[in-house]
Swiss-Prot record:
This is Maturase K. Its main location: plastid. The lineage of its organism: Eukaryota, Viridiplantae, Streptophyta, Embryophyta, Tracheophyta. GO terms for biological process: mRNA processing; RNA splicing; tRNA processing. Keywords: Chloroplast, mRNA processing, Plastid, RNA-binding, tRNA processing. Belongs to the intron maturase 2 family. MatK subfamily. InterPro entries: Domain_X (IPR024937), Maturase_MatK (IPR002866), Maturase_MatK_N (IPR024942). Pfam families: Intron_maturas2, MatK_N. It comes from Medicago sativa.
Length: 506
């Protein structure tokens, strides 16, 4: 962060807050290499035709200074000598430069907004993606309806650039960014297909994710404005939104649009209890009130995406379900609200009568079928469940093979320990345990039974089931009833920053 600040202040003193000159600075690409962002493009690859090194970056910067090579039209982009024969190579280099440069001011803005160390400490546990589940356990039992929404895509790259312009004021920088996108994303029509976006996101992951996150942030900022206008209660907690250029003008225009189109509905659309949760491209909207108000939110979202972001979205893609009757998927878990009925006998004077008590509880379940599909895709078993070995690991030592399987089992157990039903998790552990035994038997060219009898590895493989209990026993006494109760109840770990590779959240 300090390096960012030094380099940006040096450029500000010369160019008055413009980002465009930073594209031609070699230290920008040095930062990308030294900080080891997603994937480094500056290490030499012997198996490739191009040598990824800082020397090539320096030559690229020199050629970018030649303005006659940058005058490119959409029709002759493939013939321009600037890009040469290796288009993907230049795409990676320039994309990395754009991503680093455009992230600098927002890193500085975020760091300046969190000046006190206590503020950072207080939000430390909230970095975990599992910190959302205690919130859901506390709030969702009082709600009745839930809407499972997937943020629509693909969005045209021009819309992404226009959204970014509200944050950064630098016309030459965006001119060069458009030039880059025109030449590397086949930006020939306003209709953007999923295949073209997928190709661009794979070849330029950091830049694409940065632009996509701005799209989501813009959508959520408008949603936050609508939520505050439609609720009697003030919002107590919200994410930090950076100040943007022309935001207030856009907001006034948005008020005029909604006042004109929804003048009869906005006046009584008051939802005092509504909760919104998002992870990546999926969001969940839950409310206590009638489905009529949820339908209003549904149409607001559709009009917002189609009229403001020019993204096609159909009403049938947004489902509104009753929490007590339907489950929804979030972060690899299945969630639903279970209604428990209990009968209490009460007596008053000479009369006795029965009282029915209904209580709600949020069930968080491991999705066993999607997990088995993920294990089958990773070649641990087939889709029906029978075990197969991992022959690609047969060249490793026995200790390395066992350690690999234990690490996978440990990560899954760590991730899914918040489940209210642990039997499904034990089935996954059992599949991994037998797959490990079968891989070891395949390596030694023996049957599973003969291998276990000869090597006595059965006791060693018990770690698949006992490791989690040993960790809990370090915290609680072994002879206490607390340990047995924790094995059955949910335990959320607040150190999980991303979902497991085997988690299927489709």
């Amino acid at each position: 962060m300090k390096e960012y600040q030094v380099y940006l202040e040096r450029a500000r003193s010369r160019q008055q807050d413009f980002l465009y000159p930073l594209i031609f600075r070699e230290y920008i690409y040095g930062l990308a290499y030294s900080h080891n962002f997603n994937r480094s493009i500056f290490v030499e690859n012997v198996g490739s035709d191009s040598k990824y090194s800082l020397l090539i970056v320096k030559r690229l910067i020199t050629r970018m200074y030649q303005q006659n090579h940058l005058i490119i039209s959409a029709n002759d982009s493939n013939k321009n000598p600037f890009w040469g024969y290796n288009k993907n190579f230049y795409s990676q280099i320039i994309s990395e430069g754009f991503a680093i440069v455009v992230e600098i001011p927002f890193f500085l803005e975020k760091s300046s907004s969190l000046e006190e160390a206590e503020i950072i400490k207080s939000y430390k546990n909230l970095r975990s993606i599992h910190s959302i589940f205690p919130f859901l356990e506390d709030k969702f039992t009082y709600l009745n309806y839930v809407s499972d929404i997937r943020i629509p895509y693909p969005i045209h790259l021009e819309i992404l650039v226009q959204i970014l312009r509200y944050w950064v004021k630098d016309a030459p920088f965006f001119h060069l960014l458009r030039l880059f996108l025109y030449n590397f994303s086949n930006w020939n029509s306003f209709i953007t297909t999923k295949n073209s976006i997928s190709t661009f996101s794979k070849s330029n992951p950091r830049l694409f994710l940065f632009l996509y996150n701005f799209y989501v942030c813009e959508y959520e900022s408008i949603f936050l404005f609508l939520r505050n206008k439609s609720s009697h209660l003030r919002l107590k907690s919200f994410s930090v939104f950076f100040e943007r250029i022309f935001f207030y003008a856009k907001r006034e225009h948005l008020v005029e649009v909604f006042a004109k189109d929804f003048s009869y509905t906005l006046t009584f659309f008051k939802d005092p209890l509504i909760h919104y949760v998002r992870y990546q491209g999926k969001c969940i909207l839950a409310s206590k009130n009638s489905p009529f108000l949820m339908n209003k939110w549904k149409h607001y979202f559709i009009h917002l995406w189609q009229g403001f972001f020019y993204v096609w979205s159909q009403p049938r893609t947004i489902h509104i379900n009753q929490l007590s009757e339907h489950s929804f998927q979030l972060l690899g878990y299945f969630l639903n609200v279970r209604v428990n009925r209990s009968v209490v006998r009460s007596q008053m004077l000479q009369n006795t009568f029965l009282i029915e008590i209904f209580s709600k509880k949020l069930d968080i379940i491991v999705p066993i079928i999607p997990l088995i599909r993920s294990l089958a895709k990773a070649k641990f078993c087939n889709v029906l469940g029978p075990l197969i070995s991992k022959p690609v690991w047969a060249d490793s030592s026995d200790f390395d093979i066992i350690d690999r399987f234990l690490x996978i089992c440990r990560n899954l157990s760590h991730y899914y320990n918040g489940s209210s039903k642990k039997k499904s998790l034990y089935r996954i552990k059992y599949i991994l345990r037998l797959s490990c035994i079968k891989t070891l038997a395949c390596k030694h060219k023996s049957t599973v039974r003969a291998f276990l009898k000869r090597s006595g590895s059965e006791e060693l493989l018990e770690e698949f089931f006992t490791e989690e209990e040993e960790i809990l026993s370090l915290i609680f006494p072994r002879d206490s009833s607390t340990l047995h109760r924790l094995n059955r109840n949910r335990i959320w770990y607040l150190d999980i920053l991303f979902s497991n590779d085997l988690v299927n959240d489709e």
